[in-house]
Structures are given as structure tokens and as C-alpha cells.
Amino acid sequence: MEHATPLAVPLGQAEVFQALQRLHMTIFSQSVSPCGKFLAAGNNYGQIAIFSLSAALSSEAKEESKKPMVTFHAHDGPVYSMVSTDRHLLSAGDGEVKGWLWAEILKKGCKELWRRQPPYRTSLEVPEINALLLVPKENSLILAGGDCQLHTMDLETGTFTRALRGHTDYIHCLALRERSPEVLSGGEDGAVRLWDLRIAKEVQTIEVYKHEECSRPHNGRWIGCLATDSDWMVCGGGPALTLWHLRSSTPTTVFPIRAPQKHVTFYQDLILSAGQGCCVNHWQLSGELKAQVPGSSPGLLSLSLNQQPAAPECKVLTASGNSCRVDVFTNLGYRAFSLSF
């Protein structure tokens, strides 16, 4: 009597699927743990991977040290943005933000602590949340994205306390002016808007594309990245990457780079930017290109500077984008190695 042979899953099918996933992966977001020793990276499949920076940077590091210590499914769609508080990792996807305890994640217990959805205009609306911003002085979180509004959430109660309206198209990016309670937002409508949190109103608008020296009509008017340092702001996207004096709404430096930039940050006396192309660009405030440091991804979407004082040995710049890798720069001048999903 012959026994029926059970249908077997072809050997290697799971590995082929994982290889295809990695091939088509985009890493949208990063966040460093409060202790500074771990890095969270969120991808287009809704996964968050946790890497041990301390293990990867160790003199005894092996290839395995550059792989995630844990990977978990966080959202049904892409993980567009992440930030960390002193205890929590906050992640945003389509229509909602979730909270996770760092202590539990590191024990590999990846159950969400809570989830919140901003009060959208209709129950059918599920807009992406492109940007998260912590406002430490008021213990709040600002969310912005596809519904063209900035929503403020009280981190203690989990309630949404205000919605700021003014953008006419979806919002890409947020930045905080720490010395004054003001938030900047940049969007697809080509405007950077400044909001005074004390009065919950828009107090300044800069329509970047209307300034001839910044305008690049062939790239569009969208603002994809911005950063602020007291009276100064740098922003880019469709228009050229430009340094602005905020009080006078004046563009002071237009940086000579053709590729649209997707992330920008101030660092010491430099401006770091990245976007289309594999390089992290180091700019003097005068507009001079000090360095272009190549990475392993064909396009970059996120830069993260780990400056946690608790872990000076993990002080690195990490860059991610259109690949399954997170490049690690141990000094700003070269890529030391890459972490990989």
C-alpha cells in the first residue's frame, strides 16, 4: 500500500520571498533609543527592525552584529515616521500613530502599548502620517501628513488637543524652533508655514517657489525637507535647497545641487542634506560643498544623528532610503559599514 506524499513547500521559497522583499525595500524612518545604544528603522512593508549600535560598533563585531536583533510587524502599510521619548518608541503609518515601550522591545516583546488616530473629517479617510515631532516643553506630539493638517496629541492623556489648518495639500515635514514655541511645516503646496503654539495660529508663510533664485518649475513646488536653528531655516524639495533668514523671510544661500533633497539637518557649523543620489552632502553655511560622502543606497530619505550623551561610543550618523541597508558613518567623512534588514 502506497502512502500519499504530502505536498511540500519548495525548499528555499521563504528565502526567495525575503530576498525579493529586501530588493524592493525602502527604509523611510529611523529613531535612536533613549540610551543611545539601539537604532529602530521602519520600512515600506510596515516592519520595524531594531539594531544594536553598540554591538555593530564593537571591536569584536561580526557580520551577524549588523543584522536586526529583532524585527516586528508594526503597521499594515509603510512606517513613514518614528520618534523616541525617554521611554517610548512612537511610529506612524497610514492614519494612526502607535506607542511601543523601548524596554519591552529590547526584551523582544513587541506588543503595541497604544494606538491613536487623529480626528479626521470622515471615517473613510485614512491619510498617511508623514511626520512626527515631539514638543518637550508641553509634553506633546505633533502629527502631519495627508489630510493637510497638524494634529497635536497630549502624550500624557493620549487626547488630541488642536488641529492647525492652512496647508492646501499634504504635509511632508515638520521642525521645531526650540527657543520659541513655534513649529514649521513644509508641504506639497510649496509653502513653509510657521505656527505659534501659544495661540494655535499660523504667523508666517514662505512660498519658496515664488522666489526666482529658489524656483525650479521642472521639479515642482513641493517642500520635502526642512530644519531650523533659531533665526535660520533650511528647506528643499522641488525648489533648490536654500538657507533662509526667518525674521526677514529672506533667502540668503542657495546651495548648488540639482537633485531634489529629501532630508536636511543642522550639525555644528554644517548643514547635512540627502535625497536623490547616494551621497550625504556636507555644506558650509556660505553654500560651499565641503564633502559628498557616498553611501550604499541609490537614494536617501532619512538621516539620523545619534547624539545621546549616555552613549558617546555610539555617536554616529546613519542614513537610509531606497534599499534594505542603513549606512553608518562613524565620522562624517566616510561610511564605516551598513546595517541590513
Swiss-Prot record:
InterPro entries: THOC6, WD40/YVTN_repeat-like_dom_sf, WD40_repeat_CS, WD40_repeat_dom_sf, WD40_rpt. One of its GO terms (molecular function) is RNA binding. It holds the Pfam family WD40. Gene3D superfamilies: YVTN repeat-like/Quinoprotein amine dehydrogenase. One of its GO terms (cellular component) is THO complex. WD repeats lie at residues 22-61, 74-112, 124-163, 166-205, 215-254, 256-293, 295-339. The modification Phosphoserine is found at residue 180. It is found in: Nucleus; Nucleus speckle. The keyword NADP does not apply. One of its GO terms (biological process) is mRNA export from nucleus. PROSITE patterns: WD_REPEATS_1, WD_REPEATS_2, WD_REPEATS_REGION. Keywords: Apoptosis, Developmental protein, mRNA processing, mRNA splicing, mRNA transport, Nucleus, Phosphoprotein, Repeat, RNA-binding, Transport, WD repeat. Disulfide bonds: none annotated. Component of the THO subcomplex, which is composed of THOC1, THOC2, THOC3, THOC5, THOC6 and THOC7. The THO subcomplex interacts with DDX39B to form the THO-DDX39B complex which multimerizes into a 28-subunit tetrameric assembly. Component of the transcription/export (TREX) complex at least composed of ALYREF/THOC4, DDX39B, SARNP/CIP29, CHTOP and the THO subcomplex; in the complex interacts with THOC5; together with THOC5 and THOC7, plays a key structural role in the oligomerization of the THO-DDX39B complex. TREX seems to have a dynamic structure involving ATP-dependent remodeling. Belongs to the WD repeat THOC6 family. Component of the THO subcomplex of the TREX complex which is thought to couple mRNA transcription, processing and nuclear export, and which specifically associates with spliced mRNA and not with unspliced pre-mRNA. Plays a key structural role in the oligomerization of the THO-DDX39B complex. This is THO complex subunit 6 homolog. It comes from Rattus norvegicus. The lineage of its organism: Eukaryota, Metazoa, Chordata, Craniata, Vertebrata. The gene is Thoc6.
